[in-house]
Amino acid sequence: MRLLRLNSSHAKMVLTSLTFVLAGSLPAQTTPSAPANGNLTAVPDASTSSPASGNATPPPVTTNGTTVLPDIVVTGREDDLVGTADSATQGTVGAKEIADRPVMRNGEMLETIPGVIITQHAGGGKANQYFLRGFNLDHGTDLAIDIDGMPLNLPTHAHGQGYSDMNIVIPELVQGITYEKGPYYAANGDFSSAGAAHITFFKSLPEDLVSLSVGMYGYGRAMFASSTAIGSGNLLYGGELYHDDGPWTHPDDYQRVNGIATYSQGDNDLGYSLTARAYHGTWNSSDQVATSAVDSGQIPFFGSLDPSDGGNSQRYSVQGEWHREDANSSTKVNAYAFYYDLDLFSDFTYFLTDDIHGDQFEQKEHREVAGLNASHTIYGKLFGREMENTFGLQVRNDWISDGLFQTEDRNEINKIDTNPADPNFGQVIPATIKQDAITQTSAGLYYENKVQWGEKVRTVLGLRYDLFNFDVHDEDPANSGDKLESLPSPKGTIIFGPWDKTEFYLQGGLDYHSSDARAVTQTTNPDASPIGGTVNGLVPTKGAEVGVRSSAIPHLQSTASLWYLHSNFDSEQLFDNDSGIATTDGQPSERYGVELANYYTPTDWLTLDCDWGDSWAYFDRPDGDGGKMVPEAIRQVVSAGITVHDPSGWSSSLRLRYFGPRALISTGAAYSSSTSLLDWQVRYKLNEHCEFTADVFNLLDRRDHDIDYYYQSQTSPGAAPQTEVHFHPVEPFQMRFGVNFRY
């Protein structure tokens, strides 16, 4: 077929029509531009005008009394990284790629990273569940996420270790996402074993923006952003109001308010920025439900077994950034502080423990955080070869108050264990299960060396050293304690090439994630079950990877990688945030897989992309069920799309997302279903100031599962407990319509 060679408007109309009916496509991968300063620094941040990454917005220019903001240069997937990237699985997603994707939930922006899957098993205000590289990452355990250098992950969180809530992000203000996968980057510390995503926000806008949208199931959203010159700098401010009920029989009634203000000054060589953010959200929670409850007609497909589940959360932050760069060196400093709280009500087992009052519980948290990131890079030569030496420091302190309580209809209440199979059958379960005051302090030092040894050989060597202090004050003095731990993490990469616009990568490294501080010091469980001894607060991982990146075919960016990761989880004490119970049942596991990504732009109006990955995850030895498969570990994932931009103002994007079946228990006796979704976006630019949008989600109205679990529950009082699949359904076919005003 010669269609891709046509330049006529007729060909564009044909391909625009094709997006209405096609589910697949060709190629995908995200890539940023080469560094402008000619140094060895590989993938720059998502924009050449991002103060958070050491590149500030240039100062405004005044002409004839009118202040004009500078042009903003955004990098993206089509950029060629051959010769600059340190890995085949490193890249940048630009604002244009994010805008061209139909996104139902903010967290789905991260699905622009090849291999990442985002799901949800509860109400919209709860953090998403992340999957990558053979991991069910829960709410962020091994995926480090930051916004303008401020960490999003929360250690020792009331609900889950490394909890990362993307609801604080306003998508239109995201300038780009830079990502790295694997334990090979000295600057990435806690929670980065599977990967890291760095989200960069605009510091100025070329024009003001107002966006209004409405849709099915009670969806509505209003957003505005404005950028203006103040003195020799720029002030950007914006906000968002959001509401969504969802298709659930008991509406989510998710309400979200976001606000941001950023003042920036300077240029790429010298500048700073100050940013304040605020987020508040409240919601009802449509938690996962038992398959038998749906099959028997007890509840409908979009029903709930405990309609009083839900929660609320707030996060308020301030941060400042300063940078400078010259021909000899560069320095970046980023300081931040934020307040966070969460009040979450959940019920996953319904009446298994107490068939009178039910099994709902509350997880409550208040947290204050302060931290600093600083790095200094020296540009020089080694035996006449170009060299960079980077020295970095990252410090953080979390003051945390966590609580776990028994509740009914969101009211704290004493309960009675009515399950004859429980060792505490007939005993009173107090309303307060566990309360802790925690101070967690971390400091990370790192060094990275880059040398261009010859025309075809580069190396990147790094060493990171982390120090953590876990200080826990529990209501039970036996579970209180103060523990200091440290861990070195060497890393290395060799890059060969390029030959014919193709280069090869060989990587290896060590990394880690921190344990929940309560697990580090806990010696007795709320149910008096044994723990089995103390364990490490820092859980090491090690990995290796071989990869290739090529732009040999014109307009096609392609990468391929084979990777391996081993997690030493037998040194980790597992802490169940839902029960307050700690065990030493963790055991080491290994994961390995393959990833292919392609991004093809044959013309300036057509983009085709496709990512594919497969991974395998096994315990080193059989677990208690007798199997070696890691439950819920991600297997196959496919993301593919076709995007057309017509000069007449029309654009369209059709995307396919496939999330393959996963073993739900180690023996493979129970598997999840696969999920295949087709989403479609159409945009029409009426003029320079007005644009209309339409997003269609789950175009084929498939009744798939967003996520699956396998465990025991009891769906009603007096019913027999069942061990079965529990699932949260994907949302059905729905449409959202919007209008954007720029002025």
Residue ranges and their predicted role:
Residues V214-H243, W248-S286, S308-N328:
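Transmembrane beta-barrel wall of Gram-negative outer-membrane proteins
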Residues M150-K181, T200:
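Short acidic/polar hinge/loop motifs at secondary-structure boundaries
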Residues Q90, G107-L154:
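Extracytoplasmic beta-strand/coil segments of soluble accessory domains associated
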Residues E321-H323, S330-S346, G497-H513, A519, ...:
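Membrane-embedded beta-barrel scaffold of Gram-negative outer-membrane proteins
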